[in-house]
Design a protein with these regions (language model features):
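Non-catalytic terminal regions of proteins
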Residues: 2-190, 194, 359-466
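Acidic, low-complexity proline/glycine-rich segments
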Residues: 204-219
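Active-site recognition of the HExxH zinc-binding catalytic motif
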Residues: 242-258
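Conserved helix-loop functional segments at active or binding sites
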Residues: 253, 257-261, 287-294
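Post-HEXXH active-site segment of zinc metalloproteases
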Residues: 257-279
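An active-site-proximal "capping" alpha-helix that borders the catalytic cofactor pocket
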Residues: 274-290
């Protein structure tokens, strides 16, 4: 687990996390890690290849450890009892593909959002942007729900499923880039009718934001305002920033003029559609933060800095170049700001017009909102084309792009709608909008920094070292 970057110092008086040192938790972690190499991708264990007498004691250790820890989580009594039952059922099936639907339905963290409330989470699951296999994982976490955030959620940004959280400790599936705990990742016999919660680790978001942004600012010679600099030095303040960003972003997926299912979970679309949707949610957050700042909210300006810096510096150069929709969204924001004179790259230094940047950022948000509203009256292929035209006004497509050649090059001779949509998606290059020369250079310089944030948390972080 990587808690520190080379540029961040350890806080000498960091509080001890007692449950993370509890003997039962340590036994639970060890048993989970011993089970990991025995499990297949779907979470099952092949007893023709692994001796059962090797597996049974490990699962028994998990069950007894959960039972020993359960009194620390009286609010999760029904859930932890269901975990024990699901583990027993898994053993009874001969460790076939695990089914933890009963325990998933019993775990309802959104029903009790209390600041500092702790949860023990045990599920067979994959971790988004982390481990793709449904291994058994265990996480100790804390809910972040300060009164000011609860008041905003009650009165302005209703989001009953949103659960901001921080890590206390975790198994290897979270020693990755994953910053979310989502119910849809859990191994179940059938998906619930609806999901009722979603957890986002604001400490991981804040810590990697601070590390990457601090290094990017130094590399690019960017002069930033004093309040932005102090944000980068304060882990707790950055976490408060991200819980507000996440609250508004997450809510925005289901608000506005939406020509499609807001999360597009069951739809296949060209990847720029996902990129525009995520960017729309972030730019809406930025726009709301501008308004909140005018009303005196103390976190609102920090949210504006965070959206700009994370979108401009981390998103475009994180991950691979295969349908990297978040990277595309970050490039689009940079190009839009650049073409509208809100930022400049001259003499090997980046400069931002801090007065103009909010206006231009909100203008890009307005362009995407117009695209969405117009899309309600368009057939799907026409909407995809309009979105491509918006993106390609600011980002240069790959020279070999079929889409860039126009509708004449696309397979509109197909008359079956499903076949046409599939062919249009198949015509998209994996890297339809390659990195600009600016981002190619930045990627080489930041790649090591970004790699160092794998598994990062807020534990033990204080100010940025000089």
């Amino acid at each position: 687990m990587q808690n520190l970057s080379p540029r961040l110092a350890v806080a000498a008086d960091a509080p001890v996390q007692n449950l993370a040192e509890h003997p039962a938790w340590l036994r639970l972690k060890d048993a989970v890690e011993s089970l990991r190499p025995l499990q297949s991708k779907d979470g099952s264990i092949d007893l023709s290849a692994v001796q059962r007498h090797t597996v049974d004691p490990l699962v028994a250790t998990v069950r007894t450890a959960v039972a020993e820890l359960a009194p620390h989580f009286p609010h999760d009594a029904a859930y932890l009892a269901a975990v024990d039952a699901d583990l027993a059922k898994w053993a009874d099936t001969g460790y076939r593909e695990p089914d933890f639907l009963d325990s998933l339905l019993a775990f309802q963290p959104a029903d009790q959002r209390e600041d500092g409330l702790q949860h023990l989470v045990v599920f067979p699951m994959y971790t988004q942007n982390g481990n793709p296999n449904r291994n058994l994982e265990a996480v100790l976490l804390n809910v972040v729900w300060p009164e000011w955030l609860a008041e905003l959620e009650r009165t302005r940004f209703d989001n009953p499923m949103f659960v901001p959280i921080t890590f206390n400790d975790f198994t290897a599936g979270y020693d990755t880039n994953s910053a979310v705990l989502f119910p849809e990742t859990v191994a179940v016999r059938k998906a619930p009718e609806r999901f009722t919660w979603g957890g986002i680790f604001c400490d991981r978001e804040a810590a990697r934001f601070r590390v990457v942004t601090t290094n990017a600012v130094d590399l690019l010679g960017l002069e930033i305002p004093a309040d932005a600099a102090s944000l980068l030095e304060d882990q707790e303040r950055a976490q408060q920033t991200f819980v507000l960003w996440d609250l508004i972003h997450d809510r925005t997926h289901s608000h506005g003029d939406l020509p499609f299912d807001p999360f597009m979970i069951k739809q296949r679309s060209p990847f720029w559609m996902y990129g525009l949707e995520e960017l729309r949610c972030d730019l809406t957050t930025f726009k709301e933060a501008v308004q909140l700042e005018a009303e005196g909210n103390e976190h609102a300006r920090d949210v504006q800095y965070a959206v700009l810096f994370d979108r401009l510096f981390r998103f475009p150069v994180s991950g691979d170049r295969v349908r990297n929709y978040d990277g595309m969204g970050g490039q689009l924001l940079f190009a839009y700001l650049h073409k509208h004179d809100a930022l400049r790259w001259r003499d090997n230094r980046l400069s931002i017009d801090w007065d103009r940047a909010p206006q231009v950022t909100n203008a890009l948000c307005a362009e995407i909102e117009t695209l969405y509203r117009d899309g309600i009256d368009r057939p799907k292929p026409a909407h995809w084309i309009a979105a491509y035209e918006l993106v390609s006004r600011y980002l240069t497509p790959h020279p070999a792009s079929t889409w860039a050649k126009g509708t004449e090059a696309l397979p509109f001779d197909l008359t079956d709608g499903k076949a046409l949509n599939k062919a249009l998606c198949d015509a998209v290059l994996p890297d339809e909008f390659p990195l600009s020369m600016f981002y190619e250079a930045l990627s080489k310089k930041l790649s090591g920094v970004i790699a160092s944030t794998t598994g990062i948390t807020g534990a033990g972080l204080q100010g940025v070292a000089a």
